[in-house]
Amino acid sequence: MSASTAAPARDRLRIAIQKNGRLAEPARSLLAACGLSWRQSRDKLFCYGESLPVDLLLVRDDDIPGLIADGVCDLGIVGQNELDEQASARRRAGLPAAYHAVRGVGFGQCRLMLAVPEEWEWQGVAQLAGKRIATSYPAILADWLERQGIDASVVELSGSVEIAPRLGTADLICDLVSSGATLAANQLKPVELVMESEAVLAGAVREPADARAALLAMLLRRMDGVLKLRDSKLLMFRAEQGNVDALRRLLPDADPLVQLPDDGNGALRLQTMCHGAVTWQRLEELERAGAQGLMVLTVERSLA
């Protein structure tokens, strides 16, 4: 075991992620791609970092902002919706900002939307006046209603929001929507977007100034490298000099072409990093424009 891994407990970086749920596996995979590995405790709530002094806490997603605010952990991967909800609640309670979104992590996309019974004829937000809206995000919804100038009642529920209209406890709902299947199953239809959300890496407003600062900087650099390359491919091919400009125009989402040492066949050897989809149709189009020996390679990590 290295000296850095055996560092004192709070010289170690702590990251909270969802124990179960739709963000759990993508979050763990992202951190593993950054070179982190762990030894899990018996209670399966704490994972001790083995490759680096970076530990994991496996918790409920709505606990993550509070753990960051209290200094229990330094970072967390959580939905922007959950982060904004608790930040708004803190602001309404007169508490200072304690955390912020450091960067998006490219998964967990969803929308917080108003949904009404299917029989409603939706005519716009003015229709909400005097209505009861059930939600698990009361602070976000209250802020949104204020911006819209609408006086409506917010009914806070911790779960099963979609059945509130059928139970008579609300007229409509404000809830997260991914595919819309749950709404349709409960005879509801989405009508108004309240916010777009995705998973984010959240951190404390006041960053650590001790040994954790270097760990944080290293982790963020690695994560940027992973995220940049997540949908990228290395494209390699040969081409005659006269075809290079035409090929470059077919690669608007790619880095500048890099010329490799000549292989003795007369053609240029070129490579570039493509940041969009590299489909069969795209390869065939490049071939027609003069590219030869096309190869598409997956790139796992990069330091830029």
Swiss-Prot record:
One of its GO terms (biological process) is L-histidine biosynthetic process. GO terms for cellular component: cytoplasm. GO terms for molecular function: ATP binding; ATP phosphoribosyltransferase activity; magnesium ion binding. Feedback inhibited by histidine. It holds the Pfam family HisG. It catalyses: 1-(5-phospho-beta-D-ribosyl)-ATP + diphosphate = 5-phospho-alpha-D-ribose 1-diphosphate + ATP. PROSITE patterns: ATP_P_PHORIBOSYLTR. Its cofactor is Mg(2+). Its EC number is 2.4.2.17. Keywords: Amino-acid biosynthesis, ATP-binding, Cytoplasm, Glycosyltransferase, Histidine biosynthesis, Magnesium, Metal-binding, Nucleotide-binding, Transferase. Pathway: Amino-acid biosynthesis; L-histidine biosynthesis; L-histidine from 5-phospho-alpha-D-ribose 1-diphosphate: step 1/9. InterPro entries: ATP-PRT_HisG_long, ATP_PRibTrfase_cat, ATP_PRibTrfase_CS, ATP_PRibTrfase_HisG, HisG_C, N-reg_PII/ATP_PRibTrfase_C. It is found in: Cytoplasm. Belongs to the ATP phosphoribosyltransferase family. Long subfamily. Catalyzes the condensation of ATP and 5-phosphoribose 1-diphosphate to form N'-(5'-phosphoribosyl)-ATP (PR-ATP). Has a crucial role in the pathway because the rate of histidine biosynthesis seems to be controlled primarily by regulation of HisG enzymatic activity. NCBIfam families: hisG, HisG_C-term. PANTHER family: ATP PHOSPHORIBOSYLTRANSFERASE, ATP PHOSPHORIBOSYLTRANSFERASE ATP-PRTASE. HAMAP family: HisG_Long (MF_00079). This is ATP phosphoribosyltransferase. It comes from Xanthomonas campestris pv. campestris (strain B100).
